[in-house]
Regions:
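Alpha-helical transmembrane signal-anchor/signal-peptide segments
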Residues: 28-48
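Secreted/periplasmic serine-hydrolase-like ester/acetyl group-modifying domain
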Residues: 123-230
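Hydrophobic membrane-insertion alpha-helices, especially the h-region
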Residues: 7-27
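Membrane-embedded segments
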Residues: 57-144
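Short catalytic/ligand-binding loop motif for oxyanion handling, primarily in non-cytosolic enzymes
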Residues: 60, 112-116, 166-168, 243-246
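Short hydrophobic beta-strand that contains or immediately precedes a catalytic carboxylate
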Residues: 50-54
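Extended hydrophobic/aromatic segments used for targeting, binding, or gating
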Residues: 214, 221-223, 227-229, 233-268
Length: 268
């Protein structure tokens, strides 16, 4: 009788564990952001010469495979859609947890987003959904996560259960994990029709516009972190954009201002 009870208990526990694992794997948001970051953590430890940090400018404009074919260096983008400067410090720590790159290139458009572009919880989850459990993950969630939804950052299926976002590119993510590496090295993009309206010419334009106070404060805080930690392998960039509207031109001008602030801290 006792043997039968033990056997039944083992079966129940096994079923519960299997159900938990299935929910954990299948009920997560699967999109290009998760596939890209999951792929980053699959890269061999300390195998990357360059890591690029930023938002869509990085993974749509730079090809790690082409860079290797043309110039012989290994690289990977640690980048998510609409990634913003608040998260850069945590992301630097994530990069350093598995890689020791000769260069970390940071595309800084994410320092110029206005409040309308800061749906912060969505952007945070694009990062934390792929992060392995670590002190940095705990610190990041404690600093930026919603107090009422703490559990869902560690168990994403709590958040995405029954959601269409849990399906997304699930087959692609399964293929990634079966393959064990990212075939495209994080690159992603989509086709668009060519813009036929007026494009503002900014060649040689050095005009500046003040950054909002909160934006400048966060930028300076991140730069101070880089300086205090002697991150000599960090360089900053602002990838080119087609400027078609006044608000984009003003962001371009703020980019010029940002460049001057970056120089104040001794960085290029």
């Amino acid at each position: 009788m006792k043997k039968k009870y033990v056997s039944r208990t083992i079966k129940i526990l096994s079923f519960a564990l299997a159900a938990f694992l299935i929910m954990t794997v299948t009920q997560v948001r699967c999109d290009h952001n998760k596939i890209r970051l999951d792929g980053f953590y699959m890269e061999e430890k300390n195998s990357l010469d360059v890591v690029l940090l930023g938002a869509s400018e990085v993974y749509t404009a730079f090809s790690s495979s082409l860079a290797y074919d043309e110039y012989g260096f290994t690289s990977y983008p640690y980048a998510t859609e609409a990634n913003y400067v608040d998260l850069f410090e945590s992301q630097i720590k994530e990069i350093q947890s598995t890689q020791n790159p000769k260069l970390i290139l940071i595309e800084m458009n994410g320092a110029l987003y206005d409040n309308k572009m800061k749906d912060k919880d969505v952007k945070l989850r694009r990062m934390t959904d792929s992060m392995p459990f670590s002190q940095n993950k705990i610190d990041t969630i404690n600093q930026f996560g919603s107090e009422d939804e703490k559990l869902s950052y560690y168990l994403p299926w709590v958040m995405y259960h029954g959601s269409k976002s849990a399906i997304g590119r699930f087959p692609d993510n399964i293929a990634l994990h079966l393959r064990g590496y990212s075939a495209l090295k994080g690159v992603s993009g989509k086709s668009k029709s060519v813009y036929k309206g007026k494009v503002i010419d900014v060649e040689g334009d050095t005009s500046k516009k003040d950054l909002p106070a909160e934006t400048e404060e966060k930028l300076r805080s991140f730069l101070q972190y880089c300086k205090d930690n002697k991150l000599d392998n960090v360089v900053f960039a602002k990838f080119p954009h087609r400027i078609t509207k006044k608000k984009f031109y003003e962001r371009f001008q703020m980019g010029n201002t940002m460049g001057e602030i970056i120089k104040e801290y001794g960085f290029d």
